[in-house]
Structures are given as structure tokens and as C-alpha cells.
Amino acid sequence: MSNFPDNKILIATHNNGKLEEFKQILKDLDLLILSSKDLNLDEPKETEDTFIGNARLKSRTSCNKSKLPCLGDDSGLEVHALGNQPGVYTADWAYTKNGRDFNQAMNRVWNELLKSKQKEPFTANFVCTLVLTFPNGNEKIFEGRASGKITWPIRGIGGHGYDPIFIPDGYNKTFGEMSDLEKNKISHRNKALKKFISFYNDYNN
């Protein structure tokens, strides 16, 4: 039977911004939330070509090493005018020899849109896929999406990644201009984690 020993769950990430988002959304659960960084676990390279493939890779690898239930996450930005790029390569677009530079990545998105000769609005989705792996091999999958559009120039300093160029549907400000609390209510990661919360609550009732 799958369970949560000692009410612990491992989040397979070294990304502090992502981890804080997880903790904020899951704060009402009776769970001790640990990260790969807390346990000194290396992050596997994202070698798959789908969100679910990369999330599963991270979840299984970290679960096998820690012997704890583990949530692996892969998320990204799909810009429709760019054929859903950067997609699973969202983080790669920010890669530099000195680490990730998301200002560079956001500039690349906008420059690619200008080269595409397509007209605004430049619709896009943020996608989050979560894979929950238990030490016995059982697995659950949760997905969330946030629809919106790309804007320029960069707006706001909040959030992380591409947040300052993404305006969610129904709003006139970017994720980067929102408070963490406001963003977390509508984000793709929130929608995926709400599905996990429903699973967790059903499991414990």
C-alpha cells in the first residue's frame, strides 16, 4: 500500500523559488516538505522530450534514493506562435556558461516572436506536470495549465522564470507583477497541486 511515512514528502527540486511555491500552496496539509537540496540529492539531467517524462525521471530518481514519497515537477512555457516552444526546453533557453539567465530567455522569446511575423496577441500556456512516486513503485500524475499571452517589455520583479512577460487570462498584469499569494491562486503549479491535495485528502479519509 502507498503511504506517507512520518507525514513526509520530498519535492525533487533545487529551485528555491519553486520550492517556496510548493510550500505556500501545500501549507495546510499535515506534511513535512523536504527538497532534494535538503537531502543533498543530485538532480538528474532532464533528458526526456515531454513534461511527464522529465517529471517522472526526477520523481523516480529521488524516490529511489530517499525512500520517501516524491513529487517530481516539470513545467514550462508554450508559446503558440512558436509551435509551443520553448516547451520542455524552457529552462534550457535560459542557459549560459555562468548559470541560468531568464532575462536572456525572455528576450529570446520576444525576438523569436518578432521573427515569426505573426500578430498579437501572442497566446501562451504555462504547463505544470507533477508525478508522485511512492517507494513501492506506485505512481500518480497531476497536470495544471494557466492560459494567457506574452507581453513586452518585461513587467514586474516578482515570481521567477518567465513570469514578467506572461499575462494570465482575465488579468491585466503579469505573473511578475503579482504578489506570491495572488499568483499562487491561479498558477499552473497551483492547479496541478490542487489535484494532488484532493488526492492526498481522499487518501487520508
Enumerate the language-model features and the residues they cover.
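Anionic-ligand binding patches
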Residues: 2-10, 16-205
